[in-house]
Amino acid sequence: SAASDVYKRQELEKADIIVSSLPGSKSTYHLLDEEALAHVKKQPIFVNVGRGSLIDSKVLEKALKENIFSGAYIDVTDPEPLPKKNELWNLNNLIITPHVTGGYHLEETLNRIVQISATNIKNYCEGKGPINRVNLEV
């Protein structure tokens, strides 16, 4: 609706960090499109742990290359799985981790996942690399 579009724009204009855990649906498919990104506050951090279909990989790539997002941390992509030759793998301001569904972990596993994620976000904000890297050449 028009009211929800206005609300979305207003929230995007204020957010220093945009975090999505939205499910995949018709109403969330490519919800963050180029029009929505025209309304984001200057260089927020983007985190997507919901579904990759929230933002098309080409739109995400453009947002990161043009510093619309200062950086991003995702564990979901569009398409999934992300092809090895996709340009997103080469961006220094993007952290991609495996998507691990909730509710199926021992408490200590969940705590470790949160600890690693928090450390990686902190490292990114301080200009450091993640504590664990994916080697695509292996």
Task: Indicate where each model-derived feature is located.
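C-terminal helix-to-coil terminal segments
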Residues: 80-138
